[in-house]
Amino acid sequence: MLCCMRRTKQVEKNEDGDQKIEQDGIKPEDKAHKAATKIQASFRGHITRKKLKGEKKADAPASESEAADKKDEGPAGGAAENKESEASAATEASAADSAQLDEGSKDSSVPAEEKKGNGAADTGSEQPAPQAATPAASSEEKPAAAAETESATKASTDNSPSLKADEAQDKEEPKQADVPAADTTATTTPAAEDATAKATAQPQMETVESSQTEEKTDAVEETKPTESAQQEEVKEEESKADQENA
C-alpha cells in the first residue's frame, strides 16, 4: 500500500510540473539558453568597453600632443607677430628720421650757401696780404737751402778717404777667404776620388760575381737534362738486349 501511495504522489507531482510549464509557456531548456545568451552578451559588452577604454587612452596622448603643439605654435605665432610689428614700427621710425634729416639738410643748405658767399667776400679782401708776404719768405728759404747743400758736400768729401779705405779692406777679406777654401778643396779631392772609386768598384765586383754564379747555375741545369737523357738511353738499350736474349 505504501509503495502505491508513493508512486501515485510522484505522478501527481510530475503532473503539477507539466501544468506549470504549460501555464508559463517556457521550458527549462529555453531558460538555460536565455541565461547563456545573457552571459555572452555581458561578456561581449565587457570586451567592447575595454576596447573603448584603450582607444580613449590612445587618443588622450594624441590630444595632449596636439594641445602642446598648439601651445608651442601660439607663442611662436605671437613672437612672429611681435617681430612684424616691431619691423613695421622700425621702418616707420626710419622713414620719419630720414624725412627730418632731409628737412634739416635743406634748412642747413641755405645758411651754408650764405656763409660761402660771405666767406668768398672775406677771402677776396684778405688775399693780397699773403701774396705780398710769400716773396720775402721764399728769398729767406733759398740761402738756407744753399748752406745745407754746401755742408753736406763738404762732409761727403771729408769722409771719402775713409770710405775708400773701408772698401779696400772689404775687397781684400773676400780674397783671403777664397784662397783657403781653394786649398781645402784641393786637399779633399784625392780622398773623395778614392772613396768614389771604391764605391763604383764594389757594385761592379758584385755584378760580376752574380753573373758568374748565374752562369754556373745555368751550366749545371743544362748538364742535368743531358745526363738524364743518357741514363734513359742506356736503360732502353739494356731492355732491348734483354728482350733479344729472351
UniProtKB/Swiss-Prot annotation:
Membrane topology designation: Peripheral membrane protein
Gene Ontology terms: cellular component: cytoplasm; cytosol; filopodium membrane; growth cone membrane; neuron projection terminus; plasma membrane; postsynaptic density; synaptic membrane
Protein name: Neuromodulin
One of the GO BP terms on file: tissue regeneration
Record domain IQ: where: 32-61
Lineage: Eukaryota, Metazoa, Chordata, Craniata, Vertebrata
Subunit organization: Binds calmodulin with a greater affinity in the absence of Ca(2+) than in its presence.
SMART domains found in the cross-reference section: IQ
Sites of S-palmitoyl cysteine lipidation: C3, C4
GO molecular function list: calmodulin binding; lysophosphatidic acid binding; phosphatidylinositol phosphate binding; phosphatidylserine binding
Compositional bias per record (Low complexity), positions renumbered to this chain: 87-99, 125-157, 177-203
Keyword Transcription: no
Family: Belongs to the neuromodulin family.
Residue ranges, compositional bias (Basic and acidic residues): 9-33, 164-176, 213-225, 237-246
Organism listed in the record: Gallus gallus
Tissue and organ expression note: Expressed in neurons.
Region span, Disordered: 1-246
Cell compartments where the protein resides: Cell membrane; Cell projection, Growth cone membrane; Synapse; Cell projection, Filopodium membrane
Role, per record: This protein is associated with nerve growth. It is a major component of the motile 'growth cones' that form the tips of elongating axons. Plays a role in axonal and dendritic filopodia induction.
Keyword list, A-Z: Calmodulin-binding, Cell membrane, Cell projection, Developmental protein, Differentiation, Growth regulation, Lipoprotein, Membrane, Neurogenesis, Palmitate, Phosphoprotein, Synapse
A Pfam entry, by short name: Neuromodulin_N
Gene name in the database record: GAP43
Post-translational modification: Palmitoylated. Palmitoylation is essential for plasma membrane association.
